[in-house]
Amino acid sequence: MKQLRLDYRVMGCSRSIIRQVPERWTELTQEQFLLVAQMYRGELDDSTFLQRFFRLPKQLKNIDEFFQYHLSEQVEFLVDCRVRMDHFIIPSVGKLQAPVARLKGINFAHFMFIDTAFNHYVRNERDADLDRMIALLYIKQGEIVVLPDNPTKPLSSHLLDVRKRTAEVAKLDPVVKYAIFLNYVFIKRWLSKAFPFLFPLDESDDKEEVGKKKTKAPLVSWLDIFDAFVGDDIAQMEKYQQMPCTTAFRLLDKRIRDAQKK
């Protein structure tokens, strides 16, 4: 984060404002991130974006190209979407809560559902797939996506009604939904760093294309991956489903790495 001082004149009087300006994606506030999402969706021109992003006073509503250029330089990092992020910038939408940092609290089965919906959306660009992804990703406190087959104690949680929640998510602001999608792309890039064999990344992607809907996701069958993970240990299938997703990723990543060495 850096401090920016803007000096200007109004009616012959000198004025100045000081703003704290982020230097990287992880320093964006929720409000700033939503503005970036609007810009990426083509809903804001450069002048309006800068006006709102820097919270410029109304006297600077019509900034000239020179001023606009220098403001743009302060946030030029926003041009490059090749970002790795382990958390969600938007922590909640109403009563729906995002996973905490590093996907803590998400089990392997839950992640497979989320990522399958994400891959479908990226390939087919159907809003219904994005709505389903967000419905699975942002859930209420106490909700679970996959019930244990044989719970050892009374459940304090209740099962998510995915169909009902998807219909509710469909009514959210499209900008919010796009911001969540973009953030999840950043999460996937973090996973590619932490688990490079399980989540291989094509670094040849153009920096302005990463995160855009037209980028095609590879065909990933999490069902096949899960079957290979479980193998002949069918009796322990539930254990694998309920395993923290990052624990499963670590085991799978090691298996793939070891197999490639042979």
Where in the sequence are the language-model features?
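An amphipathic, hydrophobic-aromatic interaction surface with interspersed Lys/Arg
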Residues: 1-262
